[in-house]
A protein has these predicted regions:
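Bacterial N-terminal signal peptides that target proteins for export
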Residues: 2-15
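Bacterial N-terminal signal peptides
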Residues: 13-24
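Well-ordered beta-sheet/strand-loop patches within structured domains
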Residues: 2, 31-54, 116, 123, ...
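Short stretches within intrinsically disordered, low-complexity N-terminal or propeptide regions
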Residues: 7, 25-29
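Cationic-aromatic interfacial patches
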Residues: 29-147
């Protein structure tokens, strides 16, 4: 039998002895480090119930900071590094700061804190990208959107169990409009970095045939905007007139080729302001949680137009008048479903109009607004002579009011109903001249339609072969007639001051209600910045 040499035996004994002595110490150190990591993670996550619950249920397994998490960690850092491209607030998920934190984490306690910070960044990124960085109705009560945020547990389960890059790609908005807005954002940032669109036009208005420095400035600015080829011509010629017309069409202006006061004002708006509009539009796109491939009515309030859209294409279009830019009369942003139309409608006067407009008139003259009926709670007409209007206040007035079907009815000859808590609908109007105006904000909130009969024919054509004849027959009776739509039609009242047209070119509209300015302020406060713009 062979025995180890004495010196080898002593060395082996020493190693065995050392292992026996050090094993408890090494195990104790490992347990201590694990405890430090867990304690740090738990303490850091304590302020966020969803994150704390996730780590408790997974026995504090790492998502980002373990040696096996490299792919997931790299995918997240790469994704959140694009926050600026989306017009999102970089500080919420600062990839650079997280990278530094990872590189400088010296202790298990540091690693526990970084683990939670990366989870917070991931959840914030996922929520903001899929449902927006803002809660719109908290910022403006006129923006009524159902913001459907994905539950943190769902997001964490996906990233823990799925391919990291695929999960992060799944979060990205996919609409063509969003992609085009991102492209426009990059283009505007490049334009700003290159010096913008040059000097503003030093004139209040210009017309074909004019000459001089202001015309040169107008030409140069339109060249930089891409509406005109470079030229040394100093006069307002046909080429410049065509460029002005194209600009007007892209900005919702009366397209007459003359650079009037409104046109010059729009031309003088800088790329920085347009960039703000695009960033706000990106945020609004993130709120759009509905299928735009199905047939629907799209009313873009600042565009003063309603369209029937199907598979991304316009199949019907009409001008509209929207609510006045005063409190309680601005048209809200929301979505619902059109269920029916009413031909020869009566008009149930809204309570706000009754007490603010009609009651004061009737208190001065009981025969005022003679086209309006006073009605009781059962809908019965009340003789005016039996009512002492002066005895009532706005709060105590017990009657309603109604305008029967007539040529002068405030709702015209047809209204299109998508019942909602805002009491907003589309309707005809006897006030046709307002549709010729550039800015069409004159109603009490409802949407007046320039071509209501054509809209009715279009809607009915989906359920009958004789749409026009059937509509006219009901109209000729003079009686109030309800026609149900066999298939309800989604209606979306939206507010985009920047959006791509059918050819993909960016178009801009006035911020008629000032909502974009308010949203930009909120985004800026959250940490969104204009790239390349010095503050």
């Amino acid at each position: 039998m062979h025995f180890p040499a004495p010196h080898k035996l002593s060395r082996l004994s020493l190693l065995v002895t050392l292992s026996l002595v050090l094993a408890p110490a090494l195990a104790s150190t490992a347990r201590s480090e694990a405890t430090a990591f867990t304690q740090s993670l738990a303490a850091t996550a304590a302020s966020d119930a969803a994150i704390a619950e996730w780590y408790r249920t997974t026995n504090y397994e790492t998502l980002w900071t373990g040696p096996e998490d490299a792919e997931r960690r790299a995918a997240l850092l790469a994704a959140i590094a694009t926050a600026k491209d989306h017009g999102l607030p970089v500080p919420r998920y600062d990839a650079r700061a997280l990278t530094v934190a990872l590189q400088t984490a010296e202790t298990e306690g540091d690693r526990g804190r970084v683990e939670v910070e990366m989870t917070r960044a991931y959840l914030a990124w996922a929520q903001d990208l899929t449902a927006g960085a803002l809660e719109p109705q908290k910022i403006d009560a006129g923006i009524v959107r159902e913001i459907n945020r994905i539950e943190p547990k769902v997001l964490l389960t996906r990233i823990a169990n799925g391919d990291p890059k695929a999960v992060l790609d799944w979060l990205l908005p996919t609409s063509a409009q969003y992609m085009q807005l991102m492209k426009a954002k990059l283009g505007l940032e490049a334009q700003i970095a290159a010096g913008g669109w040059g000097a503003t036009v030093p004139a209040s208005a210009l017309a074909p045939g004019d000459t001089g420095p202001a015309v040169i400035a107008l030409r140069d600015r339109l060249v930089r905007m891409g509406y005109l080829s470079p030229s040394a011509v100093a006069s307002y010629d046909r080429a410049l007139q065509a460029a002005v017309t194209a600009f007007q069409l892209n900005h919702g202006l009366i397209a007459d080729g003359a650079a009037g006061e409104g046109t010059v004002a729009e031309i003088n708006i800088g790329p920085e302001e347009r960039l703000k509009s695009v960033i706000v539009a990106l945020e609004r796109e993130r709120w759009m949680h509905f299928d735009r491939s199905v047939k629907h009515i799209w009313v873009n309030l600042p565009d003063f137009r309603a369209r029937i859209m199907e598979d991304g294409k316009t199949v019907f279009e009409t001008r509209v008048v929207i609510g006045k830019n005063v409190p309680d009369q601005r048209s809200p942003e929301f979505s619902d479903e059109m269920e029916h139309m009413v031909i020869n409608p009566s008009w149930g006067v809204p309570r706000s109009i009754i007490v603010k407009e009609y009651l004061p008139l009737l208190q001065r003259n009981p025969n005022a607004v003679s086209h309006i009926q006073v009605i009781d709670g059962r809908g019965r007409v009340v003789p005016r002579g039996s009512v002492n209007f002066a005895a009532y206040s706005a709060r105590s007035f017990p009657f309603g009011m109604r305008q029967p079907p007539s040529d002068g009815n405030a709702l015209g000859k047809v209204k299109f109903m998508f019942p909602n808590v805002h009491n907003i609908y589309l309707h005809d109007t006897p006030s046709k001249s307002l549709f010729d105006k550039e800015v069409r904000a004159y109603s009490h909130g409802c949407i007046r339609v320039a071509d209501p009969f054509a809209l009715a024919h279009e809607l009915l054509s989906w359920q009958t072969d004789n749409a026009e004849a059937e509509f006219e027959a009901a109209l000729d009776t003079g009686k109030e007639t309800t026609v149900k739509l066999k298939e309800h039609l989604p209606v979306h009242l939206v507010y985009f001051t920047a959006y791509p047209d059918a050819k993909g070119r960016m178009t801009y509209r006035r911020d008629v209600y000032g909502r974009d300015a308010v949203l930009w302020g909120a985004l800026s406060e959250a940490g969104v910045e204009l790239a390349g713009v010095q503050g």
